[in-house]
């Protein structure tokens, strides 16, 4: 019996150690990088892809930068690349091209050579978007160095300050007599005074006279219409 208890204790202890080792181990191990012969140095591999464009048309001017310019790699004719002699750590891998833009990728290398890749997000640093390894970096589109020339439209013509300065006074002259009661003498005097304040140059025609003539024409027409209606009414009687 004591031997059986000892065996059970040893079995339980082994199970506990196994559970602890499993909890501290990596549940999702990444791919192992190719180790170099000169110590704990590894190789970052991947491929750059530009949809619809031949690699020969843009790879000659493109470079692979690891952590700025600490490590520099070049692209092959098929778009693949390999950056050698990289120690373990966390690095930002980006492809620099004057023709196309690529999203940077962060690669984490453990001391055992396991690789993990994720997108770099400078705004939401806590957000992790896993990427496959070896890297498959696609171009986001061509660079835009110049702004598109704006085309001419009717709104540009109507919103021109010179056009507005010419059109607005005409609208005021045409619509104001229809809105304001021109038969009121006090209202007419106030309008004449306000228009004279806007006309300080004596060489220009007097605005008050123009407004008086304009209102007098409207009042004479209304008076003539009233007289005509009255005469028609007397004739009917």
Curated annotation (Swiss-Prot):
Family listed: Belongs to the EMC7 family.
Molecular function via GO: carbohydrate binding
Residue segments, region Disordered: 215-237
Membrane topology: Single-pass type I membrane protein
Keywords from the UniProt entry: Endoplasmic reticulum, Membrane, Signal, Transmembrane, Transmembrane helix
GO cellular component: EMC complex; endoplasmic reticulum membrane; membrane
UniProt cross-references to SUPFAM superfamilies, sorted A to Z: Starch-binding domain-like
Record lineage: Eukaryota, Metazoa, Chordata, Craniata, Vertebrata
Record-linked InterPro entries: Carb-bd-like_fold, EMC7, EMC7_beta_sandwich
Subunit composition and interactions: Component of the ER membrane protein complex (EMC).
Lumenal-side segments: 24-156
Role of this protein: Part of the endoplasmic reticulum membrane protein complex (EMC) that enables the energy-independent insertion into endoplasmic reticulum membranes of newly synthesized membrane proteins. Preferentially accommodates proteins with transmembrane domains that are weakly hydrophobic or contain destabilizing features such as charged and aromatic residues. Involved in the cotranslational insertion of multi-pass membrane proteins in which stop-transfer membrane-anchor sequences become ER membrane spanning helices.
Localization in the cell: Endoplasmic reticulum membrane
Cytoplasmic side: 178-237
Name the UniProt record assigns to this protein: Endoplasmic reticulum membrane protein complex subunit 7
Signal peptide interval: 1-23
An annotated GO BP: tail-anchored membrane protein insertion into ER membrane
Parts of the chain that traverse the membrane: 157-177
Main localization category: endoplasmic reticulum
């Amino acid at each position: 019996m004591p031997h059986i208890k000892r065996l059970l204790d040893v079995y339980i202890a082994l199970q506990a150690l196994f559970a602890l080792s499993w909890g501290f181990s990596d549940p999702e191990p990444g791919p192992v990088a190719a180790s170099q012969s000169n110590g704990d140095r590894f190789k970052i591999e991947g491929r750059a892809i530009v949809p619809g464009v031949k690699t020969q048309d843009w790879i000659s001017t493109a470079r692979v930068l690891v952590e700025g310019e600490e490590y520099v790699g070049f692209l092959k004719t098929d778009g693949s690349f390999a950056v050698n002699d990289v120690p373990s750590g966390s690095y930002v891998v980006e492809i620099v091209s004057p023709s196309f833009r690529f999203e940077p990728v962060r690669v984490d290398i453990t001391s055992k050579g396991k690789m993990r890749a994720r997108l770099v997000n400078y705004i939401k640093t806590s957000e992790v978007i896993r990427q496959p390894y070896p890297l498959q970096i696609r171009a986001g589109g061509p660079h835009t160095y110049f702004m598109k020339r704006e085309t001419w439209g009717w709104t540009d013509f109507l919103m021109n300050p010179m056009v507005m300065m010419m059109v607005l006074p005409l609208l005021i002259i045409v619509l104001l007599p229809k809105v304001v009661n021109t038969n009121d003498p006090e209202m007419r005097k106030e309008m004449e005074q306000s228009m004279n304040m806007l006309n300080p140059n004596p060489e220009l025609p007097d605005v008050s006279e123009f407004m008086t003539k304009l209102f007098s024409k409207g009042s004479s027409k209304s008076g003539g219409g009233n007289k005509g209606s009255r005469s028609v009414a007397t004739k009917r009687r």
